[in-house]
């Protein structure tokens, strides 16, 4: 098994442990640290995939230069390696996406179960991901956004960093709401912002898929 897939499976297991810790009201600061580690590992499985396919030629500094600093030359090199991963890896990027979905659904489900997030939000998130993933998977365009809007809202490094940061802030705060009785109103604002961003990204995916037909 590839190191990237092992990392994905590990962070998936870590998220399930995280759900249990939330439910038993484990100390919030430790729970939030574990949540942060799970999110950080999401970046590392992508790196490990590139690291292996490049035969260890791409170091972490080069990868960060491409994905964080948006260096054009480094980005083109990394994208070429990622394309090779999609062609040669047994599961390609699909197992990484599955890990992302398990992690995200787990957070939405646990806070819906705790009556912090309305059920309708969870249902709409499931519908959005199900249809967007199906359409993008059929067309294989998830990393090939063509219009400036869809690139900006979905595939740009800025957009990806923003959605991950918002997920962390939102769910970390909801942990504080449940464990430490923080004010729920701020949590609702964060959930609304995250939900809106996710729906916009879903619209970008569906729009790009429809255009490619």
Where are these predicted regions, by residue range?
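C-terminal membrane-associated helical module and adjoining short loops/tails
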Residues: 1-9, 15, 30-35, 140-213
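Hydrophobic alpha-helical segments of small multi-pass membrane proteins
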Residues: 103, 122-130
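Membrane-water interface of transmembrane alpha-helices
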Residues: 128-144
């Amino acid at each position: 098994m590839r190191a990237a897939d092992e990392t994905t499976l590990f962070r998936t297991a870590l998220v399930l442990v995280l759900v249990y810790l939330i439910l038993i009201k484990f100390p919030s600061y430790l729970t939030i640290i574990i949540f942060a580690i799970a999110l950080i590992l999401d970046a590392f499985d992508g790196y490990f995939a590139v690291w292996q396919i490049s035969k260890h030629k791409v170091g972490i500094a080069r990868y960060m230069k491409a994905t964080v600093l948006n260096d054009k030359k480094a980005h083109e090199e990394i994208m070429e390696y990622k394309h090779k991963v999609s062609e040669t890896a047994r599961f390609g990027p699909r197992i990484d996406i599955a890990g992302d979905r398990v992690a995200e659904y787990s957070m939405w489900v646990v806070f819906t179960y705790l009556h912090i997030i309305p059920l309708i939000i969870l249902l709409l998130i499931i519908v959005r991901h199900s249809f967007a993933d199906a359409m993008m998977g059929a067309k294989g365009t998830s990393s090939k956004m063509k219009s400036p809007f869809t690139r900006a809202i979905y595939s740009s490094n800025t957009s990806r960093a923003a959605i991950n940061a918002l997920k962390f802030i939102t769910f970390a705060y909801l942990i504080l709401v449940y464990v430490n009785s923080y004010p729920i109103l701020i949590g609702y604002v964060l959930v609304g912002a995250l939900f809106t961003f996710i729906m916009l990204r879903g619209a970008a995916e569906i729009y790009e898929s429809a255009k490619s037909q």
